[in-house]
Regions:
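Bacterial N-terminal signal peptides
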Residues: 7-16
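Carbohydrate-active catalytic/glycan-binding domains of CAZyme proteins
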Residues: 19-329
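Positively charged n-region of N-terminal signal peptides that target proteins for export
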Residues: 1-5
Length: 329
C-alpha cells in the first residue's frame, strides 16, 4: 500500500512540476516590462521582488522563472534607506557577449535612488553557467544634490558603438549620460544631456512636483532615434492615467521633437497610446523591439476587468509615410 501511495505521490509531483514548467500564462502580471531573446526563448524582466522574470517560446504563452536576485543587493540597501529588494523598472541589453541588466532601487515619491548593474552570460536558469553577477551602482541621486531621479534606466548603443543610458522620473525629467565601453560606469569626462521635461512650478528638489514624465526608451529606426516616455500617473489601479508619448531626433543627444515640431524639453510629446477604457484604464512604461522581422511595443496596462491590476500589453508597431510609429490593434 505504501509503495502504491509513493508511486501515486511521485506521479502527482511529476504532473505538478510539468504544469509549473509549461508555458500557460497568457496574460502575465507585469509592471515596467522589458524583453530579451536568447535564440530559443523570450524573457520578460519587470518590477518585483528581486526582479520578476517570465519566459516564452512564442511571445504568447509564458511561464514563471526564478527572480534575478534572491536577496537585495547590500550596497543598494545602504545607499537607499527603505529599499528592501522590491526592485523597479529594469532594462536589459546583450552587449559584448553578455547580458547586461540595469535596475532601479528607490522608494515611492523620493529621489534618493540608485541604478544598479548586473551581468550574465546566459538567460536560461537551467544552464550551468547561469549566474547574475551584481556589479553595483552606475549612478545615484540624492535630495539636495540632484534635481533628477535615478530610476527607470534604458541603455542603448548608438551608431558609433557608444553606450548611453537614459533614465528619469518626475523632478526635472529625462536625462542621458554616456557609459564606458564596458557599460560598468559613467564615462569620463562625464557627458550629460536633458531629453524631456514637462513644465511645472519650481519646487524644492526633495519633491517630485507635477513633472509627470518617466520611463524613457530609445529605439532607432530609419535614421531617427525615437524617444518613448510615459506621461502622467501609474500605480493607481483603475484611477491611473498613464499614457505613452513620443518624439524623435537624428542625434541621440536630442533635441527630440514631436509630430508638431515641439521640443520634448518644452512640454512636447505626441501621444502614441493610452487607455481605451474598455480593456485598459491606462497603458504605459513601454519597451520596443524587433523580433522575427516585426517591431513590437510592450507595456503594462491596468486591466479594467481585473480591478486595475497591471498586465502585459503587446502590440505590433507599423510606420506611417512620415516615419512615425502606429500602434496596431
Amino acid at each position: 500500500m505504501k509503495q502504491r501511495l509513493l508511486i501515486l505521490y511521485t506521479v502527482l509531483l511529476s504532473c505538478l512540476m510539468t504544469v509549473k514548467a509549461a508555458d500557460g500564462i497568457t496574460s502575465p502580471f507585469v509592471h515596467d516590462p522589458v524583453l530579451a531573446y536568447d535564440g530559443s526563448r523570450y524573457y520578460i524582466y519587470c518590477t518585483g521582488q528581486g526582479i520578476q522574470v517570465y519566459s516564452s517560446a512564442d511571445l504568447n504563452k509564458w511561464r514563471d522563472e526564478p527572480s534575478v536576485f534572491d536577496a537585495a543587493p547590500q550596497w543598494a540597501m545602504k545607499m537607499v534607506p527603505g529599499y528592501n529588494g522590491h526592485t523597479w523598472a529594469p532594462d536589459i541589453i546583450f552587449y559584448k557577449g553578455k547580458y547586461h541588466l540595469f535596475y532601479s532601487c528607490s522608494t515611492f515619491g523620493k529621489n534618493r535612488s540608485a541604478i544598479g548593474h548586473a551581468e550574465n552570460v546566459t538567460l536560461n536558469p537551467s544552464d550551468p553557467r547561469y549566474k547574475w553577477e551584481d556589479k553595483g551602482c552606475i549612478v545615484n541621486s540624492v535630495p539636495g544634490r540632484n534635481e533628477w531621479n535615478a530610476i527607470d534606466p534604458n541603455v542603448v548603443v548608438d551608431g558609433d558603438g557608444t553606450p548611453w543610458m537614459t533614465f528619469g522620473s518626475f523632478w526635472n525629467g529625462i536625462k542621458l549620460v554616456k557609459l564606458t565601453t564596458e557599460m560598468d560606469a559613467v564615462a569620463q569626462p562625464e557627458e550629460w544631456y536633458s531629453l524631456c521635461k514637462r513644465m511645472n512650478n519650481t519646487l524644492p528638489d526633495s519633491l517630485p512636483g507635477d513633472d509627470a514624465v518617466e520611463a524613457p526608451f530609445i529605439y532607432h529606426h530609419g535614421g531617427y532615434y525615437y524617444l518613448f516616455v510615459s506621461f502622467d500617473y501609474c500605480c493607481r489601479g483603475l484611477k491611473s492615467n498613464y499614457k505613452i508619448a513620443i518624439g524623435r531626433s537624428q542625434n541621440i543627444k536630442g533635441p527630440y521633437l514631436d509630430k508638431d515640431g515641439k521640443s520634448m524639453m518644452q512640454d512636447g510629446g505626441s501621444i502614441l497610446m493610452e487607455g481605451d477604457h474598455k480593456i485598459y484604464s491606462a497603458v504605459g512604461h513601454c519597451s520596443v523591439y524587433d523580433f522575427s522581422g516585426q517591431t513590437y511595443l510592450f507595456a503594462h496596462g491596468y486591466e479594467i476587468h481585473d480591478n486595475g491590476m497591471p498586465h502585459l500589453v503587446k502590440r505590433k508597431l507599423n510606420w506611417d509615410t512620415d516615419g512615425w510609429p502606429i500602434v496596431m490593434p
